[in-house]
Amino acid sequence: MADTPTGTPRAVRIDALAFGGDYNPDQWSEDVWAEDMRLMREAGVNMVSLPIFSWPQLEPEPGVYDWAWLDRILDLLHENGIAIDLATATATPPSWLLRAHPEMMPMDADGHRLEFGSRQVYCPSSPVWRENVARMTRAMAERYGEHPGLAMWHISNEYGDHVSRCWCPESAVHFRRWLQDRYGDLDGLNEAWGVNVWGQRYTSWDHIETPKKAPGPINPTKLLDFERFSSDAMLELFQIEVDVLREVTPDIAVTTNFMSMFRDLDYWDFAAAEDVVTDDAYPDPADPISHVGAALNYGLMRSLKGGRPWLLLESSASATSWRDINVPKAPGKIRVESLQAVAHGSDAVMFFQWRQAKYGQEKFHSSMLGHRGESSRSFQETKALGHELKRLEAVRGTRVRSRIALVVDWDSWWGSSATESLPSQRLNWARQARAWQRALHLLGHAVDAVKATGPFDGYDLVVAPNLYIADAGQAAALAAFVQAGGTVVIGPFSGVVDDTEKVHEGGAPGPFRELLGIEVDEQWPVDDGLAETVAYGGHAYDSPIWGEWIEVLPGTEIRGSYASGELAGLPAVTSRAVGAGSAWYVSCVLSDDGLVAVLRDALAGAGLPARLRVDIHLEAVTRSDADTDYTFVLNHGRTPLTVAVPDGAHDLITGGTTASSPHPLHGSLARSAEPPGAWAHLTLERFGVAVLATPRAESAPFITLAPERLP
């Protein structure tokens, strides 16, 4: 994957894989701080994030600052060798600011103000909020910008987690300004929005409000523009702090912590404004295959900055506190989930939080140091993990090797998930993206993320589960990739509308018509509880939710056909040779086994391997530098797995090789019956992990269940 074109990002000032978590010393008396330092050293903690929610403590009255306690704890951390991910403390406003300016409080779509008492109680468009955010950030930067422990700046916290959209009067003013910048004049807006439907023509900018609750369906282009505007409004808020920090501390890296695959903010835009991508990841312990979705999240995180390492800035040591049922993590789960993030390109394992709270909304959220103190299971397991990470220092700075990318396009996500005016509410963008990635995971591949316009350098296969909104530029980029020998697979309901939600001339697939060699006559949603069947490769696969009546153009091969229902006998899956590559179209929502079958064939056409036998709990990801491949092999399941791995590989965790004796952490490492010097068998016990170092090869090692292997 190519680097981002924004120049060389500033480096985080820490010379190790970062390990630690959020730290809230202002929730504890100072006599606890010394104990924290002792236990942090014992656990191997080398970085903490603070003071994320401490604005009220730092500025208890307007213009009156109390820096003394923060001075003391920052110095104490530095004295103990712990780097500081220093937050700007702008995650939530102090009560005095809200009471002085109640117009700052956000408003929901029903016109109700959200009150003080939780967090993120602000309208992102509020001029007062923006002015105060800039002021507080400058105060923090001027006081601590030269602190020797400062590793990077942490701006705000989880933008949009509670308030990603605001419908208040100040948001309306900002929305109008955004629309004026986009369309120039009312004629441009009226044309883009298609206002002749239902008599919605605007004759004054002041007539345009945020899309509050209305008697019926709201104009879908207005809704789409409000999604874009809301993401941009939050980005502007972020950029205000970035600009202040660039001015005062130009050499210090800046970040804001993302929330994995988060619908409400276009992270491509946010990542371009920061130095390093950071993520808060909370796979559900109650979901036995949550690691599969996590892999897609992490693929996005590493891709947002062109493949550069990212940082896992928050995760849970066990249970969270915000699900309906907060299931704890089983013993060993902390380790395998944390090392999965490292496998996928993270140069950090951080938790929320260091010491478990005694009060407040998160007192039942697990932490590194649980309520029982150093005897707690979470502390013992995270301490062991901290020491284990030191054995993996060689992987720091390396990059994940992937030959496959999945198109992540926020416009299509927003447009295809509007609550009304679509053929079906069941065709969920995120659910389809996760299903396609899950199939590729089963077949043995880690998947990057990419924009629909690329760059596609280094990839053999690009999959686009849905590109509802598509333009000629995207089509040209994908066509050039295929012409040069790439394989692209595009999913249903793609190429339907342009960026103003107007249906393309001639219908779907719009700009992809020539590339795919098909035309969609009609979308054909499947009613709840029903499923069509699709015949593919001699097997029948269920197709719930969605189908399409398509016509193939000359030169297009029918790979699979509908086998039941009203579409029986019509094409369902097609491919077309274009230049040196091929373009596939999947017109239906296939069951998991159907997707595996189709994508297995697409992989073969792209010259990529695929596992013959699949196990959803097996994962293998390779990070590499110029000389060495570091292949992480993970068993996310509760029963042992035996896999085929390169013979003579050095396990960074155990220090052994594939010819060594059994090791209790991983089970047996024994030679297989394969030809000498080729492959060995490795048994991974429950939640087992191996990190195998081998000389860098032209292709990353492809790990399969034993005795299966590729020649």
Question: How would you label these PLM feature ranges?
Answer:
Residues 110, 114-276, 280-294:
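Polysaccharide-binding and catalytic clefts of secreted carbohydrate-active enzymes
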Residues 21, 40, 48, 77, ...:
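Conserved, mostly hydrophobic/aromatic
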Residues 205-208, 260, 271, 279-711:
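Carbohydrate-binding surfaces of carbohydrate-active enzymes
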Residues 27-42, 133-139, 259-270, 330-338:
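Short, acidic/polar
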Residues 14-17, 44-46, 78-84, 146-151, ...:
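Short, well-ordered coil/turn segments that N-cap beta-strands
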